[in-house]
């Protein structure tokens, strides 16, 4: 090989190395300049940049659980795996749906969807969330339910300029009914407080129909009968707080 051929070969290798020196870690596209590579924005890189959005975080965690339950792979999944997944859009959509409806317990809801083998395309269904919520309200810890209900009344009573203990007495009934259907005010508070019982007794037929599935009197009566010690504890707590 002549000296000219050696130099030409060396230059070719150097140019080749330069051309492939900067590449996108997401799509593997090569760039001659680092600045160009940094400015480059492929779909996978855009998804990575959105990783800290609350809805995206929920979507990622739900996707990880989905893979744990549906594959035998033991290799931990990363967010890079997630952004390249065919399920990315569906799970991010689910995450933002949970944020939008202020889902009571995202992990429990995701597990419920997986347990009931609900197709991912239906994870953002209001009907499915309502089914989950009705079941969840009857299964959750009573003190957690009361804590959430009290926090809700404190926040909204402040808006309506009334005392929190009087929220069920003087708050907007239609708004309270909506809070019941979203799980923010639990049947534990409605049935085990004086103001809650009065609230239920003053509802019109339309309001009763709206919340009936969430406060099913027969089912909750059975639950209370089986949990007499907790009922007594909840009653005492609510009475002491003036509810």
PLM feature spans:
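C-terminal recognition-helix end and immediately following basic linker
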Residues: 2-63
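Charged, amphipathic alpha-helical linkers/stalks
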Residues: 49-92
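Generic marker of "main functional regions" within proteins
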Residues: 34-37, 41, 47, 51-54, ...
């Amino acid at each position: 090989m002549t000296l000219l051929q050696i130099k030409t070969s060396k230059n070719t290798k150097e140019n080749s190395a330069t051309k492939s020196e900067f590449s996108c870690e997401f799509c593997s596209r090569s760039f001659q300049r680092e600045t160009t590579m940094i400015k480059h924005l492929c779909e996978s890189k855009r998804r990575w940049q959105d990783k800290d959005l609350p809805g995206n975080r929920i979507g990622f965690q739900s996707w990880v659980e989905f893979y744990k339950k549906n594959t035998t792979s033991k290799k931990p999944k990363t967010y890079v795996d997630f952004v390249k997944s065919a399920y990315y859009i569906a799970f991010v959509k689910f995450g933002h749906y949970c944020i939008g409806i202020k889902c009571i317990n995202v992990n429990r809801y995701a597990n419920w969807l997986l347990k009931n083998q609900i197709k991912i395309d239906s994870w953002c269904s209001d009907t499915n969330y309502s089914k989950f919520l009705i079941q969840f309200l009857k299964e959750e810890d009573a003190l957690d339910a009361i804590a959430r209900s009290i926090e809700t009344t404190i926040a909204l009573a402040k808006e309506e300029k009334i005392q929190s203990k009087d929220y069920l007495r003087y708050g907007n009934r239609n708004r309270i009914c909506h809070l019941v259907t979203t799980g923010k005010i639990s049947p534990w508070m409605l049935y085990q407080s004086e103001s809650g019982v009065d609230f239920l007794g003053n509802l019109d037929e339309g309001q009763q129909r709206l919340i009936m599935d969430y406060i099913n009197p027969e089912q909750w009566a059975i639950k209370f009968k089986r949990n007499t010690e907790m009922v007594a504890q909840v009653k005492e707590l609510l009475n002491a707080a003036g509810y």
